[in-house]
Structure formats: structure tokens, C-alpha cells
């Protein structure tokens, strides 16, 4: 993405979370440390089943008198439902505000430019993952997972065109954003196909800053920490690129007649649950492999050493 390009993500949902016990409520159920969230820091996080299986992922930022949760729009109501399940008598409000807000993607370079504008004079905020600008009507934050995904402007829908004009931005297709995310090894579409099927940590949340292993208890904290600290993580979600044929969900991926993984998300961008040990992932990364009746290769995200 060039510095003056922008992408409107109209497939993102938003949940406003407030109330006297909003902070403690979130701290007890999500994987990241809510205490670290400030007006200048946004976090990526998730919620697991009691067995440690993946459910949903989202961003959490300070917002008005509480927090704003950003997620895949089609799971907004499901997230509210699971949060309500754990709410019990807790003093917290959960409101779907997806019809009020939108997500405007800008480059990290544009974020840097914004911090240097006259009304931001004196600001020393670095362009690091999660760095957040709290303006009067908008929140602007660098993607907490990987700053190569740029920054997000969270704004009221009716202000979208004014922001684009004010920042001298040109809209491009959102496929550019999702293709970049695919190459970086970060799935963002059709994540419901992972729900309750993989351990949360297998979706690379540890590598993407989505889990704080030093915070107190959250749902399935003990098992998740055990997998990480005892080096028991044997599979990860990785991008799978088609060489020939078609890729389908549950297709088996083989290397030298050994089953090393299977497709868990087939469209629009394919991801597989892939072994990282026995055999070592370095043996088969970026080489031609069989996948059902097709040929594929597993891409190497930058965080794989």
C-alpha cells in the first residue's frame, strides 16, 4: 500500500463495552492483559473455550467511557452472546455498534505523517504495533499484530469521505489488504472455520501479540501456558498457496508421503493446520507439496525463524 492509498473494510464489526466492571470482566476472560490498554495503546486478543480451543479474535481499544472491540462483522452477535454467557451479574454493558462505525486502513507511513501534523505537535508516539492516536472523533492505531498491515482509523461511518478527503487518500480494493495479510501468514476471513477445532495458540496468537503469558487467569490460561512453556506446540496455522488444481477444506497435505497437515480454510485465501516438528517445518517450507489432487506450497511468514 502506498502512503496515500486507503482501504475501507466494510466487513468489520464493533462492540462497545462499558460499565463499572468492564475492565475486570474482560481481564477474566480474554487472552491479553487489559491493564495495558491506554489511550495510546490498542491490543489484539482472543477468547478460548475452557479446553483451550479457539473461538474468536478481536482488537480492544480504549473508547469513550469504556472499550471498543473490533472483530469480523459476521461474528459480532456471537461474541456478544458468549460474553453475555460469562457476564452473569457483572456490571458491564455490551452493545453492537457496527452500524455506527467503519474501519479505514492506512499505511504505517501515513500514520507517521499524521503524528507530524501541526495539531499533533509535540507528540512522541512511535509507529509501533498497537500505537494509538486518540483524536476527538476518531481512534487511529497501528495494527497490533504486524505493522506491515498498516494502521486503522476507527470513525463514524458518516465521516468516512471527509477523512479520506482531509488526508488526501485514494481508495483501493480491499483484496490488496487481505492478500498482504495472507502473505504475512495472518488469516482474517472465514475464521469461523477454525472455531472449536484448533487450540487457540495454534493460530499463532503467541507470535502476533495476542496472548500475555504473564497476566493472571483467563479462560484456559493454564493449558495454554503449558503448551507454550513446555514447548508442546506441534502445529500452526500457515498460508497455503495453490500451484495447480483446486484446494478444498480438509484436503490432506503430504510431504514425501507423510501427512504434514490439512486445509482448514479453503477460500478466499487458503490456510492449513501444519506440523512444525517431526518433520521440521524447514524441510518442506516453500517447496511443492501434494494437497488432495492439487499441488501447493506452504509459505514462510516472516516470524518463522
What feature does the model see in each segment?
Residues 1-57, 61-64:
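Acidic, proline/glycine-enriched N-terminal capping motif
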Residues 3-9, 13-16, 59-184, 255:
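Acidic, low-complexity central loop/insert segments
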Residues 16-22, 36, 106-110, 241-248:
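Short, surface-exposed ligand-recognition loops at beta-strand->loop->(often short) alpha-helix junctions
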Residues 40-41, 114, 130, 136, ...:
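Glycine-centered loop/turn motifs
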Residues 49, 74, 302-304:
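N-terminal auxiliary interaction/assembly segments of multi-subunit proteins
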Residues 54, 203, 208-211, 221, ...:
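Glycine-rich, small/acidic residue-mixed loop/short-helix segments
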Amino acid at each position: 500500500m502506498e502512503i496515500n492509498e486507503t482501504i475501507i473494510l466494510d466487513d468489520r464489526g464493533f462492540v462497545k463495552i462499558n460499565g463499572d466492571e468492564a475492565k475486570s470482566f474482560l481481564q477474566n476472560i480474554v487472552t491479553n492483559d487489559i491493564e495495558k490498554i491506554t489511550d495510546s495503546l490498542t491490543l489484539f486478543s482472543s477468547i478460548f473455550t475452557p479446553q483451550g480451543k479457539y473461538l474468536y479474535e478481536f482488537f480492544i481499544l480504549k473508547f469513550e467511557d469504556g472499550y471498543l472491540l473490533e472483530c469480523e462483522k459476521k461474528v459480532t452477535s456471537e461474541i456478544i452472546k458468549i460474553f453475555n454467557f460469562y457476564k452473569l451479574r457483572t456490571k458491564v454493558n455490551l452493545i453492537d455498534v457496527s452500524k455506527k462505525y467503519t474501519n479505514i486502513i492506512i499505511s504505517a507511513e501515513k500514520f507517521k505523517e499524521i503524528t507530524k501534523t501541526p495539531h499533533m505537535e509535540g507528540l512522541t508516539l512511535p509507529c509501533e504495533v498497537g500505537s494509538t492516536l486518540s483524536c476527538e472523533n476518531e481512534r487511529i492505531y497501528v495494527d497490533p499484530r504486524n505493522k506491515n498491515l498498516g494502521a486503522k482509523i476507527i470513525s463514524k461511518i458518516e465521516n468516512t469521505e471527509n477523512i479520506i478527503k482531509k488526508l488526501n487518500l485514494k481508495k483501493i480494493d480491499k483484496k490488496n489488504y487481505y492478500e498482504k495479510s495472507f502473505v504475512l501468514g495472518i488469516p482474517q476471513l472465514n475464521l469461523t472455520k477454525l472455531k472449536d477445532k484448533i487450540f487457540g495458540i495454534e493460530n499463532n496468537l503467541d507470535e502476533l501479540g495476542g496472548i500475555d503469558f504473564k497476566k493472571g487467569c483467563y479462560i484456559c490460561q493454564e493449558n495454554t501456558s503449558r503448551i507454550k512453556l513446555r514447548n508442546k506446540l506441534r502445529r500452526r496455522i500457515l498460508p497455503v498457496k495453490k500451484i495447480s488444481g483446486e484446494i478444498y477444506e480438509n484436503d490432506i497435505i503430504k510431504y514425501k508421503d507423510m501427512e504434514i497437515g490439512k486445509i482448514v480454510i479453503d477460500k478466499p485465501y487458503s490456510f492449513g493446520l501444519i506440523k512444525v516438528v517431526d518433520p521440521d517445518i524447514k524441510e518442506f517450507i516453500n517447496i511443492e507439496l501434494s494437497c488432495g489432487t492439487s499441488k501447493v506450497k506452504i509459505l514462510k511468514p516472516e516470524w518463522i525463524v
